[in-house]
Amino acid sequence: MDTDRLHVLTGGPGSGKTTLIEALAAAGVATSPEVGRAVIREQLTAGGDALPWADQQAFADLMLVRDVTAHHDALATGAVTVLDRGVPDVAGFLRVSGLPVPPHIDDAARACRYNPRVFIAPFWAEIFTGDAERKQSPEVAEATFAVMVETYRGYGYELIELPRAPVADRVRFLKARIGAV
């Protein structure tokens, strides 16, 4: 399998990942949206509690299924794809939540591989905002960044930090590094 063409964009909440993914898609780059937001929307609509502020383990399990599916779907396209988070993010989420990473999640993070260089958006206080789906504080967002660095390195990835720059500059930065210029 050619997992080198699967590029992960990770980082804490509110660091500009979704905005960057949307801009990359508009520029013609194949992308895969963050699954966590979809799970949150569905749980809120259904009155479920598999939410990051309620049942974190259930939320992680739902994210895992979708992140594994996103990985397989991106592989099937044959295209260079930028994914808004990857399977290791599920392990990172549990660590930030103070929960152990169960073997099935650790195994999935080891099995679903991506390009060895992972892009990480640093915490950026000037652009951080909360919303109905992002209830984390700036402190938790900053801690999430640090945990994602640790988590991805633990799975053998090299991290490339995105510049704190306008979206167009971030698009150019990322496209130049994935060969999509």
Question: Model segments located where?
Answer:
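Conserved substrate/cofactor phosphate-moiety recognition/catalytic segment
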Residues: 25-68
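Glycine-rich phosphate-binding loop used to anchor ATP phosphates in small-molecule kinases
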Residues: 60-113, 128
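Conserved glycine(s) of the Walker
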Residues: 16
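A glycine- and Lys/Arg-enriched "phosphate-lid" helix/loop adjacent to the NTP-binding pocket
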Residues: 98-165
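P-loop (Walker A) phosphate-binding loop of NTP-binding proteins
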Residues: 12, 24
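Hydrophobic anchor at the beta1->P-loop junction of P-loop NTPases
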Residues: 9
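Post-Walker A alpha-helix
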Residues: 20-21
